[in-house]
């Protein structure tokens, strides 16, 4: 049994608790304003907060987090935190730039795309009129009353069944009466479902749908399958209708999804969890604020008055096509506060060194460093991950750009399940975001340093250690650990430090190469063997146990490729018994010869595939070296961009650009490098 309004009620309660300061476990300080919030909600919405909280887990000093007020303004953060809890963003001409920069800093990718679209077209979906809002509120209350009535019927049926079980039944007739008393509710459910399927089969024969039988359904109420007056008071009103099937083309005529006025964005941002575990393929992705409902309607003439209050607006919207978002737009003049060049800088996003065409404006790649959404491209939502709750579920992030599917701001509910993992990976090269395959939780995969180059050949591999994980040679090998595969222990000997070292003890066997990792603390990271500056690192936790796949390891250990299996799988005859997520493999000599600049960078690895630049710390892959370097600054805390007047440093060039134009009073355009103008 599904409860359609459950997610909505939960977030309403969470927002109420936030506004009243109840059960809040963190305080976000922006300037002179304090925002109470819940860690779990912030971490679910923003990978930036998730990285902070995962590193500082158990640290009471992290209960108060201070954000840079020059990058994130208090007004912009207030709008963003309201969006996190309500999925509604107050966006207007006066605050779009501040919201864009704050969302880029906090890695709220869906908000960044909404702001970019607004800056490009100066249009957003209009909010519903006040009359419609009132009507939707009334319908939500009516739906809530129907749900309460359905729950009371369920409880009464359960009580009657318990009473029937307690009464002794020596005679067969009394046993039959008890059975009849226990089973009317399940029998009625089965009968109604069968009748619903027959009606759908009859409707498939009709070429079109009578639009007079379909009207608007409130986005706020839960899905309700309605057929007649008695079904309003049956527990079936709590049951969500069957999910649309990929092969049922004509089902679009009677199973319709509520859409809004305008669509944009990519399908990867329009995901919410399925409320039914039996849907694994294509699914209708619903927004939290708009709660798009699928309405199963019958077309009997006598049931028309009841259906008119629970009906749909767009009856023939195909599955996987355009989905929409809800944004409340302020009524402000549409005059642009920035010149066209700056708008094009914000809306551009280059892949490599190529030019990108955004809404008819061709933008060159040299201006990409100015984009306030640079951190969005360098730390986007994970393309794939494994969710371990009892068993392993593959979370599929669909990237189908052919449908121009739509953008949804409710990024705190992106858990649509899928089984086709390879189809997800085939579309990675088409999406504008340049990151893939990362999780910042305890099971997050990230690269560990390889074994040191042994002098005695393959036999000297066991017991070898790494001198420095960040200054290894170009032809080094790397691995991706996952957890709880072979049951090997991992001993943590020190805390998480900026220059910590991962020692690896290898033991070869006939089926695989197993490793036991132990973290060894080295000396001061500013001296000795470590030749890189010391920065604060935000990185995921070390997995507890790990296993290495060795099916592709040659005999020469100096050129071997160590790959980590991404899923829990056993090995038989040197081959995995079940497929896992794709592994990173070291790039060939030809690719390495073309990427000499990347080999000189710390924490950058060159791998095979279209995304050939990988972060050594967390295994994220990127199309361009610039994006990879920007992402690494999230881990290291490096701030390479300094203001020439006041000396303040920033991690992104867009942050320096805003600081120079708004807060640094001594700024002059002639003193900035040409790349920032």
Swiss-Prot record:
Keywords: DNA-binding, Isopeptide bond, Metal-binding, Nucleus, Phosphoprotein, Repeat, Transcription, Transcription regulation, Ubl conjugation, Zinc, Zinc-finger. Residues 24-93 form the BTB domain. One of its GO terms (cellular component) is nucleus. It comes from the Eukaryota. Transmembrane segments: none annotated. One of its GO terms (biological process) is negative regulation of transcription by RNA polymerase II. SMART domains: BTB, ZnF_C2H2. The modification Phosphoserine is found at residues 234, 371. May be involved in transcriptional regulation. This is Zinc finger and BTB domain-containing protein 5. It comes from Homo sapiens (Human). The gene is ZBTB5.
